[in-house]
Amino acid sequence: MHICIPVTEELQDTLGCRFVLYSVYLEGFLLFKVRYKDLHLWNEQIHRVFGNGLPKFPPKHYLAMTKNMANERRLQLEQYLQQIVTDPVVTSSDIFMDYFRKLQMDTFNMPTVKLILRVYVPDGAAVELDVRTSDSAERVLEAALFRLGVSRELAEYFSLFITHKEAKGPFTVVKRIAAFELPFLTIWNLEDDQFQIEVRKWYMNPSNDVMLMGSTEAIDILYLQAVQEFQMDWTRPTKDQEQKLQHCLKEENKLKFLELMKTVEYYGYLQIASCASDYPECDSEVNVWVGNNEMSCHFHSPGGHTEHLRLNIRDLICWNVSLLQPKKQEVMSPNHQHLEFKFEYQQGSSLKCITIRTEQAFLLSSCLKKMLSEYPVHRSKEELEIQVDRAQATHKFNIRPVQNGVHTKKQTLLKDKAEYCLIDDISDLNL
């Protein structure tokens, strides 16, 4: 999960006092708007619950802030929130969920009311859930799986996603909905009716399918998603495999279909929509698959040259996501985001760097992190360097593995379910 505060507003309260309103974005989507003093008060409250294990909150300034001081506070708030939302102990607490729920509801002026929320499965069918506008993604997922007959013990293998399907166009997985997000608000804030909430499996190693084979209802979801991947040409079956799979579809033999799909190239991978790249030359087209501990890229240059790059997760040195801010007269829209995904990898004794321009950059980053958490090696090999930066700003995050549990005053401990990292500032020159 990547937090950024690319937009601030200077406003006046009812007494005429000026204040700054921070727009907090989660993976390119507006999560909420908040004042510094409100976050400061909440920080004092959670410190009484969690003690000194929390990240340092930006200090108060009793005199008027300069422009540089205001920008420094914004960056410090980014770091603070980034660390908070990636701490599983904090995010599972009532004090966190209640406050983040309130912030989201207040930002969009949404009252808490009951409604029917449609949640889809990969074949386009929907289940209708009796929920509230204030229900979290964790609660909505639990309700959806209950309606689908999937036991609560298997919930960790599934998640809610925002997907987009044009009437005569491609299907796209846009983003994973974080457990503390409010799905109704997420979908309500999108202007296009072709966005929808969908239940999909959430693991990158296809071998994890075996964990769901004891549940008929879970198999149904796996089957529907596998059929979807097959029919959308996300997979690369041979002619013989395709004939056998088509036969299984006609016979509606779900288990046999899933068994055959395990042998098909790119089964269980997420395919990123065709996008632009600077490799092997500017304005090249690239198709990206990510899954099963690797990232596979098919490049097509304007001159007709094609190249296939297949990288194991161990070959990646670092990656970063850049959120390009619009011009001042433009408004950031979640429907059309300008994102770049830049990664470095080892090729022989040299390092190579490639930039991909895709609106699914945050999703791609999330998938890589998910693969790291599933990768069956020692912790030191799991923890790759992840850089998160925002273009047109001087602040970037550089996340490195913790070594021997020692960190300097400039570094702040970032806890994550799968890893412990250090986060500190780097300059523009480090790009």
UniProtKB/Swiss-Prot annotation:
Q: Which UniProt keywords apply?
A: Protein transport, Transport
Task: Please tell me one Gene Ontology term that the record gives under cellular component.
Answer: early endosome
Query: Has UniProt tagged this entry with the keyword tRNA processing?
Result: no
Q: Name one Pfam family in it.
A: SNX17-27-31_F1_FERM
Domain PX, by residue range, is: 1-107
Q: Which GO terms describe its biological process?
A: endocytic recycling; intracellular protein transport
Q: Which GO terms describe its molecular function?
A: phosphatidylinositol binding
Q: What CDD domains does its record include?
A: FERM-like_C_SNX31, FERM_F1_SNX31, PX_SNX17_31
Function recorded in the entry: May be involved in protein trafficking.
Q: Which family does it belong to?
A: Belongs to the sorting nexin family.
Name this polypeptide is given: Sorting nexin-31
Origin species, per record, is Xenopus laevis (African clawed frog)
